[in-house]
């Protein structure tokens, strides 16, 4: 082997090592991003489900969905919901009103704080336990200083006007602090319920 071949080999060996590092690092950073992204999306989906739960309860009490978080949080913190305890069974031959009048059944209504009713034991047991429920940060997108967007209105479906709501955020807000450029997510797209 000539002297020139040795010099070229000495230059190419470190160059190959550097290139191998960059290839490994680019693959590894994508894998790490996907792992973190999966957790962040799951966390936001859980918070969106929590907010949906509040909206549904809000509508039960107020007959409409809220289009702002102030009224939703105020409802959750300060309002109460009726819990009806039914005692007895209505016979098939009678309506509830008739059975109630005859004393066959009875109804007892109690009022409980909205947050205790909305986030009852049944709901809490169905939540993803990796992400604890924090009412003080319910409207904030995790890992960012941004809030979710909320909107409510009416939509006509098959000649029937239906009340609807949407709570959303962008993937850009979900991935705050991560290098999400050129990844498999469109940062402007919405994650919503």
Language model regions located:
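A generic short-segment signal for beta-strand/edge and adjacent turn/coil regions
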Residues: 18-20, 41, 131-132
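N-terminal alpha-helical signal peptides/signal-anchor transmembrane segments
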Residues: 41-62
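N-terminal alpha-helical membrane-insertion module
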Residues: 5-8, 29-34, 51-53
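Short, Lys/Arg-enriched N-terminal segments with co-localized hydrophobic residues
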Residues: 1-2
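Amphipathic alpha-helical segments typified by the pilin-like N-terminal helix
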Residues: 22-46
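Low-complexity, acidic interaction segments enriched in glycine
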Residues: 60-193
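Hydrophobic membrane-insertion alpha-helices, especially the h-region
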Residues: 6-26
